[in-house]
């Protein structure tokens, strides 16, 4: 496994671990003394004097042929590792970063909900400018901006809460990383102590037992040699188990750092959003609204100027017309000649018609008188004729 300085602190055993993570030790009880001395020399090169003293003390916990003691050797470290792994699992399960991403996505959606270009008629489509008055557009965008700003403020509170939780998680992971490192250091010492004790048994105890068995030829002495060799084999397996636990610690370190890096990146993203993106958005919206109000003020001023000019032009035209009409009327007499001619003609015609009517009336009365006289004579004659009869 390649080293990653970001996740692993420097340790005297790092190079040794990388080269011999799962060291398959020779189970042969007749390993040469030269090879065993090489192992001890490697230990002395990898560990400090203080650590070598600890290794010496720990190695004394291993009693030859004490199988129960060997079974419990380093077990408390593995139990702590089990508790540590359980704690890591709880941390991963209970800390869901999904809501953080959801809040950031909501923030980006809200920031895009209001576009400052909507306040600029020149950047709007012709169809939109045709169907939508600028005033209405400004009011609509301003109202939408206020609503979005309130929603952004609420999202900001959520993001700030997420950032605080992420910061707490980062500190907690720092503690977990230190626990993992302490476990890594301790299990290294126990592995080294077990190897040292194995070396002592192989170089001292077994040769003595073999020599004694060779001298006596006693079957029980020979069995004692076999028991000691089996104990070394169990010790080898115990070392292997501890090496596996150490490998878990090695793999856990970068995993913790990766989780921390993700949390740190999210916290920085939230910080950037709260301190940069949101204020920048508000500033840009404020600038856009201010520029639009200035544009409207200029348009209003232009409209007032145009209206004033139109009024002046219209008033001048009306004044000109009134002056001409007044002067024309002033030059006219009280009664026009044409009016007098028409009136006189009408009067003469009326008199002539009146005289004609009077003449016709006299003529008709004379004719009526004649008819009345005739009727009267006719009536007298009729009466006389009736008397004669």
Curated annotation (Swiss-Prot):
Coiled coil: none annotated. Pfam families: TelA. InterPro entries: Toxic_anion-R_TelA. It comes from the Bacteria. Belongs to the TelA family. PANTHER family: TELA-LIKE PROTEIN SAOUHSC_01408 (PTHR38432:SF1). This is TelA-like protein SH1505. The lineage of its organism: Bacteria, Bacillati, Bacillota, Bacilli, Bacillales.
């Amino acid at each position: 496994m390649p080293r990653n300085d970001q996740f692993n602190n420097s340790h005297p055993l790092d190079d040794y671990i990388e080269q011999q993570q799962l060291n398959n030790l020779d189970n042969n009880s007749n390993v040469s003394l030269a090879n065993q001395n090489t192992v001890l020399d490697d230990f002395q090169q990898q560990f400090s004097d203080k650590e070598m003293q600890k290794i010496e003390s720990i190695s004394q916990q291993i009693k030859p042929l004490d199988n129960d003691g060997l079974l419990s050797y380093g077990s408390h470290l593995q139990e702590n590792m089990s508790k540590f792994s359980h704690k890591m699992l709880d941390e991963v399960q209970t800390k869901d970063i999904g809501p953080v991403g959801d809040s950031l996505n909501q923030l980006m959606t809200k920031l895009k909900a209001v576009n400052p270009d909507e306040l600029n008629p020149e950047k709007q489509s012709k169809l939109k400018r045709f169907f939508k008055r600028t005033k209405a557009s400004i009011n609509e965008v301003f109202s939408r901006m206020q609503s979005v700003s309130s929603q952004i403020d609420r999202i900001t509170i959520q993001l700030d809460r997420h950032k605080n939780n992420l910061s707490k998680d980062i500190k907690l992971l720092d503690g977990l990383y230190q626990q993992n490192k302490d476990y890594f250091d301790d299990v290294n010492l126990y592995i080294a102590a077990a190897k040292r004790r194995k070396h002592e048994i192989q170089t001292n105890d077994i040769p003595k037992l073999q020599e004694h068995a060779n001298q006596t030829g006693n079957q029980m002495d020979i069995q004692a040699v076999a028991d000691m060799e089996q104990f070394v084999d169990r010790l080898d397996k115990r070392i292997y188990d501890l090496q596996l636990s150490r490998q878990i610690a090695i793999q856990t370190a970068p995993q913790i750092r990766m989780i921390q890096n993700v949390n740190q990146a999210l916290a920085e993203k939230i910080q950037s959003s709260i301190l940069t993106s949101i204020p920048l958005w508000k500033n840009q919206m404020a600038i856009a609204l201010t520029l639009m109000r200035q544009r409207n003020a200029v348009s209003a001023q232009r409209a007032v100027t145009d209206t004033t000019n139109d009024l002046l032009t219209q008033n001048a035209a009306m004044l000109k017309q009134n002056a001409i009409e007044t002067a024309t009327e002033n030059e006219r007499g009280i009664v026009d000649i044409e009016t007098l001619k028409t009136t006189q003609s009408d009067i003469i015609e009326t008199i002539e018609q009146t005289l004609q009517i009077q003449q016709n009336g006299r003529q008709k009365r004379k004719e009526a008188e004649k008819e009345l006289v005739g009727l009267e004579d006719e009536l007298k004659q009729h009466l006389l004729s009736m008397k004669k009869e």
